[in-house]
Curated annotation (Swiss-Prot):
L-isoleucyl-5'-AMP binds at residue 553. It holds the Pfam family tRNA-synt_1. This is Isoleucine--tRNA ligase. Monomer. It catalyses: tRNA(Ile) + L-isoleucine + ATP = L-isoleucyl-tRNA(Ile) + AMP + diphosphate. One of its GO terms (cellular component) is cytosol. CDD domains: Anticodon_Ia_Ile_BEm (cd07960), IleRS_core (cd00818). A motif ('KMSKS' region) lies at residues 594-598. The gene is ileS. IleRS has two distinct active sites: one for aminoacylation and one for editing. The misactivated valine is translocated from the active site to the editing site, which sterically excludes the correctly activated isoleucine. The single editing site contains two valyl binding pockets, one specific for each substrate (Val-AMP or Val-tRNA(Ile)). GO terms for molecular function: aminoacyl-tRNA deacylase activity; ATP binding; isoleucine-tRNA ligase activity; tRNA binding.
Length: 921
């Protein structure tokens, strides 16, 4: 007979190869047909809620690695929470207004804006946004992200816009919204004001000039004709100069350079002299900054007054300690100008072109005017020094062009009135990483008022009317009416109708005796859109709650969505919209460089999924320290795929050895398991506790390493290795075999559930092959619970010591292999000469030690009986010889009793007995 037929070899239809790129779409199709999201929600509907609120990605273009990282992290949490006692809905969202969509449509002359009305152009923007959402939705679903994809929230949906209007109205009612002339970050290339979050810093080469302002009226402190030196890197703002700021507490020096007398901060005299090339100079006297107040200098180009003012913002970090002040072109300049009653002069238009308020430079683009202004200063003898520097300068994040500070009439949300409430709310929120708290605290503490208006077409209109006398009209009645109009018709109605048709019927206002009104043309900053989601989504949807348990986004969102959401929520509810905030870093290439098409180092999620599958991408996300920037490359993904293979093979081995196991009839009670099997259950319990704790603390790399290590170290290298001599060789119902299978069963169930949030496709694929489970998907189960093992501490301590001894045995076997004494470990006759403690340890182990060590022969003697060539270890001495006897054809174990049963000349007695009893017909 063929003895192979008598072996209980693994049987499984769970394939060895993942073939994920082909298999995952089928699994996802099945999820969709079953409506797995709804099934999970129904199963958990009576549990406490855990709401992770999706920060809406911008609906433009394909998803990149940053999107994948973000969405997968969210999915880990939502999937885990729904398997650990919570009802965890996930409603994905999209941010859909703003300049990138306008630009995408007008680029390459696809759409000619000038040939259509604003309303028509906005319709095209909306169509484009929906198309982008469709593309991104499919890509996000392909990642295996589970959510309410059929009912996402979208910032252009009428019901969303209606709620956004209510948020604006509530803030206006509380006095937080105002219109004012103020310098704002302005992008000439976009012709619009920008929020702080829309600015990025890049290096720029600029003129750096030192300019002298002659003293007109020295107030008895300075003498007429002495000259105050200012320093600036924006010569184009000199025509807007109305003053010079000095610090009240600084000391200022008058220095003589030839015939000239210059005034600079004493602490900067040497720097200025060096920069301006003053080889010889002398300090003639010093004065206190506060004594310079109200001195009048003369504008070097126009001869008008330039007032010396006191400002706390003046520093000695750079420059001269005398700060050129143009209230129309800087935040500090504006504030100090207000204090001293200066005009807000801004001689630059929305395109960045100098106006008639800058005589001599009218019609020039501001950057081109730099040269002309510098030349004129030189001609008038006011230019002390010109050089060029490269410095970090603000740029428009979309057009990548430089921005300027420019005073315009804008709508603002005043932060100062509720700043302390914002800071309190930050304190009450849980931040991961912890430094997030300080980061947002500092931003909120230092930020000015929020400019919420944009001079664009594609966005939510600012719902303000103007009376005949120019007074802005914002009342409960108008807000409610506009909100309702938007809910019914969408915000495009604002651009389709006249003001009178947008107001409540019969509306009157004292500022409009003739009953006529106009409407605001500006739209809201897109950060106001997404920042209103706590009201439009969390508060409005029945399946969600405000505050959310968690907001999770990239670290760029401290100044973006985390900030705008906090501002609007605290303004209208007094509380943060979130209980916790988690931030992640950016995805970089394998060398830690930013991904860019020009370098050719972009890793595209779609390509990774086509080649390796979504589960590999997800496993990569779980493997990285995502709170910092993360690296990804083909080589890194290859390593992750190797780990995946190991985990999958472990699943397959466990499953294959359960083909004849029915837990209802074959499972062994925990107290009846062999000790080594109990030991494995104890190790499994530790894994379960560790992994669940790691999920709870969002430490996914701990989950990844713990599962991987358990599969490779505890299972493959030990338990599953020696198992073969039992589960393949013994008869089906042998107690040792059923004992091991019981542990295989518990281990497989625990592993598939623990890995399900990270590897949902693989987990569900395996689940579909399990005959002993009732639920149709692993997603409809809960995380595994630990199993109580009697005397677990003593058993663990005992077998941990055994494992230390086993490590020494493996080293000794390896040495014997290198010395060609043996090939495989089954060729060994292992001779142990343990020390006293280990001799007692070995005596206490009831299991077959030859099996545990995977050797054919084993003897244990006193330590002092060891031969001279025995290897010494901390546990005792070990010698390895070649086992004597023949190899049993069935078990591959070398035995002296092979052929002892003449009916089976090639089998050992043990194997002959099994065959005769169970397989002989």
């Amino acid at each position: 007979m063929d003895f192979k037929d008598t072996l209980l070899m693994p049987k499984t239809d769970f394939p060895m190869r993942g073939n994920l790129p082909n298999r995952e779409p089928d699994i996802q199709k099945k999820w969709e047909e079953e409506d797995i999201y709804r099934l999970v929600q129904e199963r958990t509907k009576d549990r406490p809620k855990f709401v992770l609120h999706d920060g809406p990605p911008y609906a433009n273009g394909d998803i990149h690695m940053g999107h994948a990282l973000n969405k997968i992290l969210k999915d880990f949490i939502v999937r885990y929470k729904s398997m650990s006692g919570y009802n965890a809905p996930y409603v994905p969202g999209w941010d859909t207004h703003g300049l990138p969509i306008e630009t995408a449509l007008t680029k390459n002359k696809k759409v000619n804006r000038k040939e259509m009305s604003v309303a028509e152009f906005r319709k095209l923007c909306e169509e484009y946004a929906w198309k982008q959402i469709e593309g991104q939705r499919e890509q996000f679903k392909r990642l295996g992200v589970r959510g309410d994809w059929e009912n996402p929230y979208v910032t252009l949906k009428p019901e969303y816009e209606a709620q956004q209007i209510r948020v604006f109205g509530e803030m206006a009612k509380r006095g937080y919204i105002y219109k004012g002339l103020k310098p704002v970050n302005w992008s000439p290339s976009s012709e619009s004001a920008l929020a702080e979050a829309e600015i990025e810093y890049q290096d720029k080469r600029s003129a750096s000039i030192y300019v002298a302002f002659g003293v007109k009226d020295g107030k008895g402190v300075l003498e007429n004709g002495e000259r105050i030196i200012i320093w600036t890197t924006t010569p184009w703002t000199i025509p807007a100069n109305l003053g010079i700021s000095v610090h009240p507490d600084l000391e200022y020096s008058v220095i003589a350079v030839g015939e000239d007398r210059f005034v600079v901060a004493s602490a900067l005299v040497e720097n200025v002299a060096s920069a301006c090339g003053f080889d010889q100079y002398e300090v003639t006297r010093t004065v206190k900054g506060k004594d310079l107040e109200n001195i009048i200098a003369e504008h070097p180009l126009y001869g008008r007054d330039s007032l010396v003012m006191l400002g706390e913002h003046v520093t000695t970090d750079a420059g001269t300690g005398c700060v050129h002040t143009a209230p129309g072109h800087g935040e500090d300049d504006f504030i100090i100008g207000q204090k001293y009653g200066l005009d807000v002069l801004c001689p630059v238009d929305e395109k960045g072109v100098m106006t008639s308020e800058a005589p001599g430079f009218e019609g020039m683009f501001y950057d081109d005017a730099n040269k002309a202004i510098t030349q004129q200063l030189d001609e008038k003898g006011a230019l002390v020094k010109l050089e060029f520097i490269t410095h970090s300068y603000p740029h428009d994040w979309r057009t990548k062009k430089p921005t300027i500070f420019r005073a315009t009439a804008q709508w603002f949300a005043s932060i100062k009135d509720f700043r302390s409430d914002l800071l309190d709310a930050i304190k009450e929120t849980k931040w991961v990483p912890e430094w997030g708290e300080q980061r947002l605290h500092n931003m909120v503490r230092d930020r000015g008022d929020w400019c919420i208006s944009r001079q664009r077409a594609w966005g939510v209109p600012i719902p303000v009317f103007y009376a005949e006398n120019g007074e802005p009209v914002i009342t409960d009645e108008t807000i409610e009416h506009v909100s309702e109009l938007f809910r019914q018709h969408g915000s495009n109605i604002w651009f389709e109708k006249e003001a009178k048709d947008l107001l409540p019927e019969g509306f009157t206002h004292p500022g409009s005796p003739n009953g006529t009104f106009t409407k605001e043309q500006d739209i809201m900053d897109v950060w106001f859109d997404s920042g209103s989601s706590h009201q439009a989504v969390l508060e409005e949807r029945d399946d969600l709650v405000r505050p959310a348990d968690l907001y999770l986004e990239g670290s760029d969102q401290y100044r973006g969505w985390f900030n705008s959401s906090l501002s609007t929520a605290v303004a209208v509810t007094g509380k943060a919209p979130y209980k916790g905030v988690l931030s992640h870093g950016f995805a970089l290439d394998g060398e830690g460089r930013k991904m860019s098409k020009s370098i050719g180092n972009v890793v595209v999620p779609a390509k990774v999924m086509k080649q390796l599958g979504a589960d590999i991408l997800r496993l990569w996300v779980s493997s990285v320290d995502y709170q910092a920037d993360v690296r990804v490359s083909d080589a890194i993904l290859k390593q992750v795929a190797e780990v995946y293979r190991k985990i999958r093979n472990t699943f397959r081995f466990l499953h294959g050895n359960l083909f004849d196991f029915d837990p209802k009839t074959n499972a062994v009670a925990v107290e009846d398991l062999r000790e080594v099997d109990q030991y494995m259950l104890i190790k499994l319990n530790k894994l379960i506790d560790k992994v669940k704790k790691a999920y709870d603390e969002y430490e996914f790399a701990v989950v990844y390493h713990s599962i991987h290590n358990f599969c490779t170290i505890e299972l493959s290298s030990f338990y599953l290795d020696f198992a073969k001599d039992i589960v393949y060789i013994e008869h089906a119902d042998h107690p040792d075999r059923r004992s091991m299978q019981t542990v295989f069963y518990e281990t497989l169930l625990a592993l598939v559930k623990l890995s399900a949030p990270i590897l949902p496709h693989t987990a569900d694929e395996l689940w579909s092959h399990l005959t002993f489970v009732e639920e149709q998907s692993v997603q409809l189960t809960d995380m595994p619970e630990t199993i109580t093992v009697p005397n677990s501490e003593a058993t663990e301590e005992k077998f941990d010591r055994f494992m230390a001894l086993r490590d020494d045995v493996l080293k000794a076997l390896e040495t014997a292999r290198n010395e060609k004494i043996i090939g495989k470990s089954l060729e060994a006759n292992l001779k142990l000469y343990p020390n006293k403690e280990n001799k007692e340890l070995l005596a206490s182990i009831k299991e077959n030690l030859s099996q545990l060590f995977i050797v054919s022969e084993l003897t244990i003697s006193e330590e002092n009986e060891a031969p001279n060539d025995a290897q010494s270890f901390a546990t005792g001495k070990i010698a390895v010889e070649k086992a004597e006897g023949e190899m049993c054809e069935r078990s591959r174990v070398i035995s002296k009793d092979v052929g002892a049963n003449p009916k089976y000349p090639t089998l050992s007695l043990r194997n002959a007995e099994i065959v005769e009893k169970y397989y002989q017909k």
